[in-house]
């Protein structure tokens, strides 16, 4: 299966008539493996800061998680594995695998829990595959 197929079929999938606003799979080096058409244009330093938070949990808390110029307040995640952020009625979930970061961005009516399930399910599968 190609990386764009993972984004289209597994991240941008329909959940009770709703879907993520945007999604992407990005390598630890900041290279885009695949992304939805709606995924924001991000800066390399934004991805570097996210990677740093996986290595040093809590490093994003004082400044927030920034992606494509949007600032998300960092909320409880799983240190070293999942970062979650909130902005208004929406937010972001980032799951780290061995080689990539899985991004899911949502807005109402999709819930944070639904976003977490979508992103973390694919991330767990890729981890099982050694990716």
UniProtKB/Swiss-Prot annotation:
Post-translational modification: Phosphorylated by MAP kinases.
Domain of life: Eukaryota
Chief location of this protein within or outside the cell: cytoplasm
Entry-linked Pfam families: Profilin (PF00235)
Positions of modified residues (Phosphothreonine): 111
Localization annotation: Cytoplasm, Cytoskeleton
GO MF entry, a single one: actin monomer binding
Keyword set includes Transmembrane: no
Described function: Binds to actin and affects the structure of the cytoskeleton. At high concentrations, profilin prevents the polymerization of actin, whereas it enhances it at low concentrations.
Note from the entry: The variability of the residues taking part of IgE-binding epitopes might be responsible of the difference in cross-reactivity among olive pollen cultivars, and between distantly related pollen species, leading to a variable range of allergy reactions among atopic patients.
Family designation: Belongs to the profilin family.
Oligomeric form and interacting partners: Occurs in many kinds of cells as a complex with monomeric actin in a 1:1 ratio.
Name of the molecule in the record: Profilin-4
Species the sequence originates in: Olea europaea (Common olive)
């Amino acid at each position: 299966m190609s990386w764009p197929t993972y984004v289209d079929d597994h991240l941008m999938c329909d959940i009770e008539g709703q879907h993520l606003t945007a999604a992407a799979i990005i390598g630890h080096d900041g290279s885009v493996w695949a992304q939805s058409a709606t995924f924001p244009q991000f800066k390399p330093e934004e991805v570097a800061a996210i990677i740093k938070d996986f290595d040093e949990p809590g490093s994003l808390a004082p400044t927030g998680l920034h992606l494509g110029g949007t600032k998300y307040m960092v909320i409880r995640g799983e240190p070293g594995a999942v970062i979650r952020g909130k902005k208004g009625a929406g937010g972001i979930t980032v799951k780290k695998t061995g080689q990539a970061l899985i991004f899911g961005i949502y807005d109402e009516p999709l819930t944070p829990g639904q976003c977490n399930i979508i992103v973390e399910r694919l991330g767990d599968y890729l981890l099982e595959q050694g990716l």
